[in-house]
Amino acid sequence: MKTSDIQIRDPYIYADQQEKMYYMFGTTDKNCWRGPGQGFDCYKSKDLQEWEGPIPAFRPSDQFWGKENFWAPEVHHFNGQFYMFATFIAEQRYRATQILTAPNVFGPYVPLTDEPITPDNWQCLDGTLHVDESGDPWLVFCHEWVQIHNGSVYAMRLSHDLKRAVERPYFLFHASEAPWVKQTGWPEPGGKYHFPTYVTDGPFLHRLTDGTLLMLWSSIGNKGYAMGVCRSESGHILGPWQQLPDPIWAEDGGHGMIFQTFAGQLMLTFHSPNRTPDERAVFVAIEEKNGRVQLQA
């Protein structure tokens, strides 16, 4: 099947150098907004155009705590093992990031621990793995705007088996710090309970060849869902983080990540449009220039 045939949000590519195979993960439930979560599917391709699948990468057991909103799986290889970071929620539970594990890239994945890795009593989503220059793993995640109104991004250092946090979460930035981010329409402006809200979605870390540490993340801009970039002034995950003034993708697309093709081309993938059921994976060539990434001319 072609890329245009696959309904997917939050696409994530694991490029397997040995197999020369691209594995695509993402939010694959037909209606990811309500109803019981079905799981996550995986697709594989040699050329990012024709895909085999779906391959069931994760299906929940009856005992799994997450019941709805199966969102944004990412797959990372760390310490010889494959790990999936994904978002779930359930009635009387907070939205959270759960880490899962498998012996191979396409699964099937099972929960690494009984409970999620993000803080108790926080509405969290879109956890990603960052390994710093000392080899220490960090969870970078969003503290969701639905709880705190001005969505934020945090980093939390993990144990090397990824089973627990070893330090408190560190605040990195609020959504409203980026000049391109606009206030959302929720709650409705002018309504009885109106207050300003700002979204943070989909953080992803990328280190340039010159050592600069960048973060992709998504929010609402002038033309709807959009994706921006910020830069760590220290080169470390704890920043401070400088928001670049303009989004890298400004209209009806976001929740992206960066990978390198087997031919050496740097690629940005994200979903667009942002409406269900029309969302599809988009692949755009990018380049490093002047301490940032930009769309390739």
At which residue positions do the language-model features occur?
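Carbohydrate-active catalytic/glycan-binding domains of CAZyme proteins
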Residues: 1-297
